[in-house]
Amino acid sequence: MKVLVVMAHPRRDSLTGQITDAVMTGLADAGDEAELADLYGEGFDPLITPADEPDWGSVNKSYSHAVQTEIERLQRNDGIILVFPIWWWSFPAILKGWIDRVWNKDIAYGSKFLSHKRALAIGLSASDAPTYAKRGYDTAIETQIVTGIFDFCGIADGRFEYLHGSTDGGERPALLLHEAR
């Protein structure tokens, strides 16, 4: 399987970056072909422009060169993995902007849907699982991404995995890396 791994963190040497590397290694070890999209590292601009807004009157929309390049990258893969820290109970703005600009009408929803077989979101959380459950954040974030994005765009096999305690010291980072593999 060809898998697009999208990382959304400003520091490549962060735990999010290390988890991304572990995911890439795990995919290669499983015989899958992984392609990395490091949104910050590549300088992706998350701001949508009029050129990239959905065109509700046409199914033959032309997008900016930057977005068309991302669409092609998205479409040449069979699966997608999003790796990101959870900030303010959601994913980073750069990832939201990437989805807004690239997962566009008649690309990911509308007259056409994504053809990806599977999608996985890996969210790194500083808080523990009981904190998320107590306030309902766990189901809210999962519903937003799995149902509101993956399923809405035609990816029936989508799931969300939390890696809790990402800012805990000691052995926790090593345990999270092991879990990611």
Model-predicted regions and their roles:
Residues 1-107, 170-181:
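N-terminal beta1-alpha1-beta2 submodule of the flavodoxin-like/Rossmannoid cofactor-binding fold
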Residues 3, 34, 119, 157-158:
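Hydrophobic/aromatic residues located in beta-strands of well-ordered beta-sheets
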Residues 108-156:
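Short, glycine-/small-residue-rich phosphate/pyrophosphate-handling segment
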Residues 60-74, 113-116, 137-145, 162-164:
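Short, surface-exposed, charge-dense and proline/glycine-enriched linear segments
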Residues 83, 121-123, 160:
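Short, conserved beta-strand edge motifs with alternating hydrophobic and charged residues
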Residues 29, 135-139, 144-181:
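Glycine-rich phosphate/pyrophosphate-binding loop and the adjoining helix
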Residues 41-45, 111, 152, 160:
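Generic secondary-structure boundary/loop-capping signal
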Residues 1-3, 124-127, 161-167:
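A short small-residue
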